[in-house]
Amino acid sequence: MEKPNWIFLGNTFPELNKIHMHSKTAQLGHGVGPKKSYYSKSDSSTTVRFVESDYRFNRLCEMYPEDNFQNVGFCKMDPIINGEENGIDFTKLGFDNNKKTILYAPTFYPSSIERFSKNFPADLENYNIIIKPHFFSMSKQKYLKQRELLHHWESFNNTYLAKVNDYSLLPYLKSADLMISDASSAIIEFAALNKPVIWCTFLQLRWNYRGIFSYRFKARMDKDYDDYGQIARPANSYNEMIKQAKNLLDSNFTQSNQANEYLKKLAGTLDGNASKRIVTFLLENC
């Protein structure tokens, strides 16, 4: 049986030595979020890991000096930057094309979903709302309460709930005018398109992450977490989030120079050629 030259991994893998007897391995993360796991994915050494920015490249080289890292840029955004991603057909969703569109893209935990009002779509009735939850929110039994709330919001005329098999966030990033999210890679991705983002800091935490146990939440996050406030508008409550959403959509938004500096720090080069650089490296190192 023919063996592949390269195998891609998205996380740590305990038996790389067996793979390396036959093939080379490349690691490529699915996002650039603030969790410490972004860096600890390199605890198992792949042949190469592709990273997005000078900052991340330098940190990883310092943490894992024996490993091979290649700074190629943020390839996930290439289809939008190159004009290959067409976005969403609002007509098929039953949306009013004259209204601006809000993308709510929460993560599964810790999440803002349970902290939102049951009347969330009504509070923003003058806008189209697309809800793109994390796959776990839509599939795991432990997040049933989240699903119940999501399906309730889906019943509003101005709201579309993405299906489980709508796995790609890119069409929604392309088409929306404003994004509301928790601390996730999506914040950086949307802001990189020079669009406004609201970062929900009011989260539903399990009891063992609250009060004297709050250190557990902080332990999940990397120091990059603090940079999100420079890229997105933090909202500390639901009512503050609603007010900010209306204000941002009614204004002529332009990303600040400071925000652009932080975006470059975390997401690196966004020239549409990151994927080509990856392919070139693979072909030259077969």
Regions found by a protein language model. Name each.
Residues 1-84:
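Active-site and donor-binding regions of nucleotide-sugar-utilizing enzymes
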Residues 46, 71, 185-266:
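Catalytic binding pocket for nucleotide-activated donors in carbohydrate/polymer assembly enzymes
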Residues 158-165:
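Active-site donor-binding acidic/aromatic loop of nucleotide-activated sugar
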Residues 1, 42, 123, 171-172:
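Structural alpha-helical scaffold elements that stabilize or flank donor/cofactor-binding regions
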Residues 270-286:
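C-terminal alpha-helical cap of glycosyltransferases
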Residues 7-9, 16-29, 166-213:
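A donor-sugar binding/catalytic signature common to diverse glycosyltransferases
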Residues 72, 76-152, 162, 235, ...:
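Conserved catalytic-core segment of nucleotide-activated headgroup transferases in glycan assembly
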